[in-house]
Amino acid sequence: MNQSKQKGTSTASTSQIVSDINEMFERYGPTFVDLATGKRSDMDALLEFYGAPLRFIGPTFHMVMKDNAAILGPAGMGGEIDRLRQANFAASNLDRCDINVLNDRAALVDALWLRRDAKGALMERFAVIYLVALTAEGWRITSAVNTVEGSLTGKGNNQTSKD
């Protein structure tokens, strides 16, 4: 499931970067789910994964969260957590996590999340490209772009070509 490509980094450093980012996403998923299901309430835990300023771009919006308060606030990730609580969200798993190392301080992560409700039914397939940067606090998501369900090319798995 995980792939890495290197651009100007040594194989050893690329391997470590991929390992570090995989570890971050292995912690991120459960933290996000626990917050969204109400098992925990320490919203500051999200700051272990996000770095301000945080840019999030979707098909109908482009928002910039300039500081930690904006990230955690109702117009930021705090609002997303609240919406999921109200929608009977219960679980999310990372179906794809392809890491493309850009250099020793940046990587793109092509991820596909599967969100499920309390009965286990699929609520949403959420594809996102993350720009992850090495900050003074460690690896942090600094930008996220919601994409069609697909890869960096933007060609979704659910699209068909008419050849």
Feature roles, as predicted:
Residues 1-52, 159-163:
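Short, low-complexity N-terminal intrinsically disordered segments enriched in polar/charged residues
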